[in-house]
């Protein structure tokens, strides 16, 4: 026991000291510098310290008319939706309705490949009949989904022939997949009622939003968002209208505000809403990541000596061990959106950035570093040479 305690103290003492949160004026100056250097038109920022929101501000504009971006402006959450989904899935695990290890096939009334998903809900789920010739779908678990190791592509419609297929044995490696998230959504929403499934994920996530006071957040479009809504800007600075998403898709349909989402991130930093065991599972290094960059999908892994040793998939996020100790992060991106969430476990400190301009990505590393110091966030892996590009 004493040896383990001494080792823990040594690791803590070896970590770089946490820097004080900069002053409001210096934060504002840093944001304006990043926006000027990248050309980004709008950016919203939240800073969390000791699990509490300490700073919240929106900068720039929300649309081509020049309407100001505000802390209550509805913005696109993009793939930060996946972390909210993972959190919700782990609550189902806590309730005994799901196991991370049980093959998802066991939660269905019939084989996955027998479902006509377009008849159930058009354009919501994957074309699972495409998997009929590959029995590996029977082995996919919730853990595989949440660690991006199902073997699916990011989305089936990105395949040359637009057919869903499994590219590697489930659980054997990391390759980012929104399609995997959609499979787990399908199982939760259409699974066996005698196992406690057949649940509406829009309602499940909304229950968390309501509990946390996130009144302007939803995984499906709400007309009351329209009066104060952010459009986007692509990498040419061209305005792109906000997509009014008509169905819940856990891979990335969340609309939110910086005020709302900072409440979720703060709750996550406080370990709130999950059992101790489920929180530990979420943050545990589950699957080592050995590629140079996150994209393209199925990229070859680097030689072992060139791989980053501390880079792992957690559940619904990426975990790492940087100069300040263990941390986690998740990004969100589309052609006109750039989001990032970075948290350091020690001190329960986080930075959350939502931008309605994809060009802001190119300044995330600088801005997060200014606020939190050197965290070790693997931005080069996250973006490669694509930061700020549509």
Give short role names for the model-derived ranges.
Residues 1-8:
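Sec-dependent signal peptide recognition
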Residues 114-334:
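Short, surface-exposed loop or secondary-structure junction motifs
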Residues 32-40, 52, 64, 89-97, ...:
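Sec-exported extracytoplasmic/periplasmic mature domains
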Residues 327-330, 338-357:
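Short, well-ordered beta-strand elements
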Residues 21-76, 97-99, 120, 158-168, ...:
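Short, conserved catalytic-motif segment at the N-terminal edge
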Residues 36-44, 65-121, 126-143, 166-180, ...:
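Short active-site loop at a secondary-structure junction
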